[in-house]
């Protein structure tokens, strides 16, 4: 069956790149079937913000188990946002929630964002994910 991993809130996608590298060098017992790496930013915003991101994105996209998605808003219903992806993944074994941000520095606002996501959409997340990491 294999394992499906969702990475939410990537910035420059270096975390996804490192995860992929580790999985290649040290394959887990259970085969990784897919990695879906997402960012809130559009692709052009990622390329503009992070100088080495094009190389990173190209490396991720070259691997057949990786799907990179931009413009994914974790505060909104995810299942619909993921339905039209090449992998059409709507269920994941592991979810890694990286760096949710509002695009500016404000600790109280960031805390409110996370609270909003977890309070407002717990049922949607439980239906979408088989296990939260």
Walk through the language-model features, giving the residues of each.
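Conserved class I S-adenosyl-L-methionine
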Residues: 1-24, 28-30, 34-40
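S-adenosyl-L-methionine
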Residues: 45-89
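Short amphipathic alpha-helical molecular recognition features
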Residues: 7-11, 70, 87, 110-117
């Amino acid at each position: 069956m294999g394992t499906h991993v969702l990475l939410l809130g990537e910035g420059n996608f270096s975390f996804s790149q490192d995860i992929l590298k580790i999985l290649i060098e040290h394959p887990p017992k259970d085969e990784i079937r897919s990695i879906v790496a997402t960012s809130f930013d559009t692709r052009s915003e990622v390329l503009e913000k992070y100088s080495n991101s094009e190389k990173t994105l190209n490396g991720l996209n070259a691997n057949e188990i990786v799907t990179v998605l931009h413009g994914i808003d974790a505060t909104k219903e995810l299942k619909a946002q993921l339905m039209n992806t090449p992998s059409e993944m709507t269920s994941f074994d592991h979810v890694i929630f990286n760096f949710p941000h509002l695009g500016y520095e404000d600790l109280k606002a960031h805390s409110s964002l996370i609270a909003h996501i977890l309070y407002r959409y717990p049922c949607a997340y439980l239906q979408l994910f088989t296990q939260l990491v």
